[in-house]
A protein has these predicted regions:
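Small beta-barrel nucleic-acid-binding modules, principally OB-folds
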Residues: 57-73
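Short histidine-centered beta-strand/loop micro-motifs
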Residues: 31-34, 53, 72-73, 109-111
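Catalytic strand-loop segment that frames the active site of acyl-thioester-processing enzymes
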Residues: 2-37, 54
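HotDog/MaoC-like acyl-thioester-processing domains
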Residues: 3-4, 8, 14, 18-20, ...
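Active-site helix/loop of acyl-thioester processing domains in fatty-acid/polyketide metabolism
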Residues: 38-58
Length: 142
């Protein structure tokens, strides 16, 4: 990991949906004092489900975490912004890309990418079985 002063600053994406903003608290830390990776993963799963929910129009479940990369540590007080976009829509499943950016508490207005992931969700019926995703205009899902 790079030192805090060497963190690469980036611009927030303009071609993805902002689906979640959250500030991690001290209770979310691991033994090293950084935010626990499992907490970040849970937030990514929640954020990743927002766009697919617009398409599935009903129950869905996370079926796969295809890729998950921790690029920088997350710290207490960071303002995390979660952006998501659809990568693929299948008959019963939808894959999304999620990118997470941190605005460090001590450096307001400056962003670094801390996490990126790809997750797949499957539309399910009341019995938990896969069901077809209704056809819709992607513009209507925004």
């Amino acid at each position: 990991m790079t030192a805090p002063t060497d963190e690469p600053r980036v611009q927030l994406p303009t071609d993805q949906d902002l689906v979640l903003k959250v500030i991690p608290m001290p209770g979310d830390c691991n033994a090293n004092g950084d935010i626990f990776g499992g907490w970040v993963m849970a937030q990514v799963d929640l954020a990743g489900s927002v766009v697919p929910a617009r398409y599935t129009q009903g129950r869905m479940a996370t079926v796969a975490v295809n890729e998950f990369v921790f690029k920088q540590p997350v710290r207490v007080g960071d303002i995390l912004s979660f952006f998501s976009t659809v990568s693929r829509i299948g008959r019963t499943s939808i894959t999304v890309k999620v990118e997470v950016y941190a605005e460090r508490f001590s450096r307001q207005g400056q962003y670094i990418k801390v996490t990126e992931a790809s997750l797949t969700y499957v539309a399910i019926d009341d019995n938990g079985k896969p069901r077809e995703i209704p056809k819709m205009d992607p513009a209507a899902a925004i």
